[in-house]
Amino acid sequence: MVEPIFRVVDLRVTRGRSSIYDHRSEGSGKLVHIHFCASCGTKLYMTFERFEASCGVYAGTFDDPNWLQIGGGNAKHIFIEAARHETILPPGIPTFLQHAMTNDGTPQEPVIFEKPRVVGKGRTG
């Protein structure tokens, strides 16, 4: 899931209406509000109790999901300890085992790989 982050004031839904599902983050204990299409159920974007001025837009909702160039200056991979089996992390992007900051706002030190790195726990059964 690629999730560009924008300011809430810059987001506009231009058609239809969304419904909201609230999910409590296991990491912060704060609510994550999942906004989805009321007609078809497609996830559109997220807003956050923890970061009230920000929203994360699901890349698959853009007409052209490749419009945003992703690199070390504008991207990060978080919660890589819970990554899907055989997830490939590209080089040069800051990565974090969990969130990029602690619950009190203290920034965490990223790990930046020089080569592509395969992560994720193997499946059993």
Give the ranges of each region predicted by the language model.
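A short Gly-Trp-Pro
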Residues: 1-125
